[in-house]
Amino acid sequence: MKLRPIQRSRLYESAVDQIRSLILAEDYKPGDRLPPERELAEQLSVGRPSVREALRILGAMGLIEIRAGNGTYV
């Protein structure tokens, strides 16, 4: 039997998957403001740096818009 290496996922990747799923399921609609980083971190049980990286990736994907000093919007 041949074993495959175990893939380690990073916390921010899981955060990206969960937030993206909520957006695609329209739990967050275009124009909606996402909760603050601190609240997302608590809900996802990850640190704020993981949330920050997830939001950066989602922004690069075009799913969200990060407005400095104003929040993050779908």
Residue positions per predicted region:
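Short linear motifs at protein or domain termini
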Residues: 1-74
